[in-house]
Amino acid sequence: MMNHRERVMAAIRGEPVDRVPVSFWLHNHAQENTAQALAAETVRLHHTFGWDFLKPQSRALCFAEMWGQQLEYSGQRTVAPAISRFALRDARELGSLQPADARTGALAEQLQALRAIRAAVGADVPIVANQLASQLRRRSIRSERFTNRVDRPSRAGSVG
């Protein structure tokens, strides 16, 4: 019988596997707001379901938090956090964003969670971490007023 990594890597290479590699990821808004909770929930789900690879689901807007976005969490697993303060109020502020420091804040928490997950599951379980497209990040850090001015093309097709 193959271990998780052998199964996933064989499938990627198009080689025979003992069974199809399986995984699943989801937002659990009540368990993804700290590195410890995200790691514990990811490891719990892995042990419960025997997933072959993991894609830890970072909290919904954690990357926007790196630039000052403030959120209010419901504590419920199916209710996304509400934005209490946008990182950007309008398009003029876009140029003021600075590169995020991976050693602090939300990004550091995500890296801490990945390290804790790796320590808990060992090297035989592949972990896939992703960063969504920068366009999606921009959409999550600005107010509706910013959306109206930048994201919606005018009838002539130009960006207003």
Residue ranges and their predicted role:
Residues 1-79, 112:
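N-terminal basic, low-complexity leaders that serve as flexible interaction/assembly modules and, when applicable
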Residues 72-160:
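Active-site-proximal, glycine-rich beta->alpha crossover segments in alpha/beta enzymes
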